[in-house]
C-alpha cells in the first residue's frame, strides 16, 4: 500500500495554489517526516509535535481523508 507521504507528494507544486500543496512542499523538506507511515494516529502525533509548517491540522485531516478514500479503501 502506498504511504501517506508518497500519496501527498502528488500535490507538490513549485507555486502552491492551496493548503494541501503547501503541506506537500513542506513535508518534502521535512527530512524527519514518517515517510513509510499509513497510520493516521502516528502521523497526527508527529505533526502536532513537529508540523509547525502547517497553518492548521485541518489541512492534514483533509489530506488524510482524501488518502483514505483514494488509496486505503481500494
UniProtKB/Swiss-Prot annotation:
Pfam families: YozE_SAM_like (PF06855). It comes from the Bacteria. SUPFAM superfamilies: YozE-like (SSF140652). InterPro entries: UPF0346, YozE_SAM-like, YozE_SAM-like_sf. Belongs to the UPF0346 family. This is UPF0346 protein BPUM_1890. It comes from Bacillus pumilus (strain SAFR-032).
Amino acid at each position: 500500500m502506498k504511504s501517506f507521504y508518497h500519496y501527498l507528494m502528488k500535490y507538490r507544486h513549485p507555486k502552491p495554489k492551496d493548503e494541501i500543496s503547501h503541506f506537500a512542499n513542506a513535508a518534502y523538506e521535512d527530512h524527519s517526516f514518517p515517510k513509510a507511515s499509513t497510520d493516521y494516529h502516528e502521523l497526527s502525533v508527529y505533526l502536532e509535535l513537529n508540523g509547525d509548517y502547517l497553518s492548521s491540522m485541518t489541512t492534514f485531516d483533509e489530506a488524510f481523508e482524501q488518502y483514505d478514500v483514494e488509496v486505503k479503501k481500494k
